[in-house]
């Protein structure tokens, strides 16, 4: 009988993720994220620990009445050095796509990586969520979080509902094999999924969160879905080359990527619609990565470089498993 090594490794990784999520959601598994440091200015004080406890019973943890000043949906957009695209995004969303939305029913925040390190899309989305959890600690679990790209939006209103319910992830735009582009998820479900991996290179974070959502039993609904090539979704051209980390591919294929709870020493301050993220530590050191340029015209599939699964990596670049 022939066996596929790739299939065996994939099944093993899925089982590891399943066990990890099970253990992390046990009664006493979570440690408080006591390194989350919101900053209003350069001398900001440390706030109390940010709890990472995930409610097991959704109805019991959802407030019956939500104040009028709490939005029903929050857009989180990973961001750095895209000022013109940001202006166009806000103009089009407010004047066209969301023009009929009641005032105060939604908020848009740009999770701004405010440092010189490689851009970490997963961490920006994770920290954007954590910042909103801090802002709405009693109600974040029932808010619909919409993860969106700054260079992408519907051409007209009423194409996308930007709403979902508990247990359902609404994927509106992207590819079927990953939760990228535009999707909506309830705060409690995002927290249960453990969020995105904090990869330092392009790609794969969307693959991981799709796997995590499925592992905990969430349904991915694509009944209102637009493929990446659909011209009804406006998407700015941003070149063909992407910076990838060879280490990310190895972690995705052979190990367990880090997650929402791996982020430490987070420092941020909010200015208008910016969440300015000045520092964070994750499960892997960006200075210990090996980066390369990838031309997306050659496809989106990232392969494990030959010999990389046998390399010796610095201990602080590997996420320490909890099982």
Where are these regions (language model features)?
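Asparagine/serine/threonine-enriched low-complexity, disordered tracts
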Residues: 18, 25-30, 34, 40-45, ...
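Cell-envelope/extracellular polymer assembly enzymes that use nucleotide-activated donors
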Residues: 72-74, 208
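Extended hydrophobic secondary-structure segments that form protein cores and membrane-embedded regions
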Residues: 76, 107-114, 144-151
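Conserved catalytic core of nucleotide-sugar-dependent glycosyltransferases
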Residues: 120-122, 144-148, 152-248, 252-253
């Amino acid at each position: 009988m022939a066996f596929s090594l790739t299939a065996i490794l994939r099944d093993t990784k899925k089982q590891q993720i399943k066990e990890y999520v099970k253990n992390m959601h046990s009664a006493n598994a979570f440690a408080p994220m006591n390194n989350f440091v919101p900053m209003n200015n350069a001398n900001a004080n440390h706030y109390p620990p940010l709890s990472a406890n995930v409610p097991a019973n959704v109805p019991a943890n959802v407030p019956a009445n939500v104040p009028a000043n709490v939005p029903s949906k929050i857009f989180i957009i990973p961001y750095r050095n895209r000022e013109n695209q940001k202006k166009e995004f806000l103009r089009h969303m407010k004047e066209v796509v969301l023009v009929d939305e009641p005032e105060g029913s939604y908020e848009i925040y740009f999770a701004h990586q405010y440092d010189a390190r490689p851009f970490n899309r997963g961490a920006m989305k994770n920290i954007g969520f954590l910042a909103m959890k801090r802002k709405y600690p009693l109600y974040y679990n029932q808010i619909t979080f919409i993860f969106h790209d700054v260079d992408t939006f519907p051409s007209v209103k009423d194409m996308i509902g930007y709403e979902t319910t508990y247990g359902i992830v609404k994927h509106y735009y992207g590819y079927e094999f990953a939760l990228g582009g535009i999707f909506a998820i309830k705060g409690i479900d995002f927290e249960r999924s453990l969020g995105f991996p904090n990869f330092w290179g392009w790609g794969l974070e969307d693959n991981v969160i799709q796997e995590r959502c499925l592992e905990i039993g969430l349904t991915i609904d694509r009944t209102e879905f637009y493929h990446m090539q659909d011209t009804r979704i406006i998407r700015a051209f941003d070149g063909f080359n992407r910076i990838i980390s060879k280490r990310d591919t190895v972690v995705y294929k052979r190990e367990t990527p880090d997650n929402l709870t791996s982020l430490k020493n987070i420092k941020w301050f909010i200015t208008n619609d910016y969440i300015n993220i000045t520092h964070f530590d994750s499960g892997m050191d960006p200075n210990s990565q090996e980066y390369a340029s990838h031309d997306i015209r050659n496809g989106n599939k990232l392969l494990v470089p030959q010999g990389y699964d046998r390399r010796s990596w610095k201990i602080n670049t590997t996420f320490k498993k909890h099982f």
